[in-house]
Amino acid sequence: MHDHCAALLGDLDSVVREFSTLLSTSKRRRLPALTQETSRKSYESSSTADEFFDAEAGDLDRSQLVIIEHQSEEDTPGSDADEASIHSSSSVSSVGDDDKVFSSSPDNLHPGKPKSLIPLPLTDVVNRRATIPQATVQPPSLIAFVRKNVGKDLSTISMPVSANEPTSLLQRVAEQLEYAHLLDAAVKQKQPRDRLLYVTAFAVSQFSCSRVRERAMRKPFNPLLGETFELLRTQGETAGEGGIGGGFRLIVEKVSHRPVRLAMQADGLAWSFAQSPAPTQKFWGKSAELTTDGRVRVTLRLPDGTDERYSWAVATVFLRNVVMGEKYVEPVGSMAVSNDSSGARAAIEFRSRGMFGGRGEDVVVEVYGSDGSRDGSGLVGTWTGGLRISDQGKPSGPEIWKPGSLVPNAPNTYGMTTFAASLNEITPLEKGKLPATDCRLRPDQRLAEQGKLDEAEDWKVKLEEAQRSRRRVMEEKGQEYRPRWFVKAAAAQDGEEVWKLKGGKDGYWEERAKGTWTGVDDLFNV
């Protein structure tokens, strides 16, 4: 037994040495001089979280620049303070002369009420599936992957399909809308403070989709450029406790490939939600830091005819134990939900349990008035279990949010919620009405859901190569890609890149109603 353990330790030491050598070699080969702004050492992709793992995000003709520093969290002084004060940067690209550019005034960056809300309200009764087939294999080991590819450019190497859960990144960001009934409920509140609390509960609720640790073991499929996802929810599905129902509609599109950026807008009868998220990551030895550039903006359309505008930057999330051990994710530090109409705000603190305390789940919310004063109201609870109205930091009122159900046997079914499991299903609401770009129609993702991983792998390779071919053709012609459904707004004052949903005859929902899908590429026909 002693010899066996010694052999295992020897193999592990060898892998760690190879991993360190690979990172050090890649650093010397590609690393420019570091600026003094770097607060601590990390492995940082200059693009997105998915590009490290997906070959479709790499460019075979041009190596992607990555910054690699090999140093563990324990070796880095002040890492706890850094986690609480992380700010993501934005990436702004040029806009073609023919593109419509929206004003960057704060009000115009928020979503307005569309002229038409078709197909709302949705009163249909839809029987959605409550689960998907269980995973048939374990996800690959990162150590084994690195060991196998020592000396290679990792940005051009594709992880196998078994590293993915059978959903798209487009669907993952759509999970923010699982608790949209909180926005309906916010509109019904008479006091501005109460509306702020409901919107804040909605902002916190998005993290609950990762409460099962197995959800951290795999990543969603990286969408192709121009790939889309629409989501419709009916009146019965969104009524909720205190909600007004009527359902909502959502469209998400991948608008940029390098760096990956999505654009999304959801509309209910009395609210609109918009975001242009660009996920990025840094590796810190044992953990990965996941940040999202792109503020969430929500507009509530109040019964008196006025609009109330809110916004927030999504908190940083850490994926723990990346290389070995039990993986899990946790939001860290703080975030603030601002009432941009009044100046009031809600300060959210995600409380840490320390280096050896395990996952931090506690959440404390404090409300500040437009003059910066506190009135003692807020929320307490956990991002995994629910939030309750509080006074002076102690529970004093009803629970206004609790997470929804998980699929049966969630640990063996990708750790999914019931809501997430329903997203890749084509229901009567979508059948025959989806554009050719909708990720539900993507063959490799569908085959992966069915457990046919070898076939999914073949399709993934074909789709990636077709995307590279399209990009080469555009580069040869000197053309710039223009998204079909969103147009870039003028940069916000802080440089944030914001995309706005087109309306009128060029709008997604108008094209859907006609069923023509003008100017839509058949991305999956390869």
Per-segment meaning from a language model:
Residues M1-D184, K188, R193-V526:
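Extended acidic, Ser/Thr- and Pro-enriched interaction/regulatory segments
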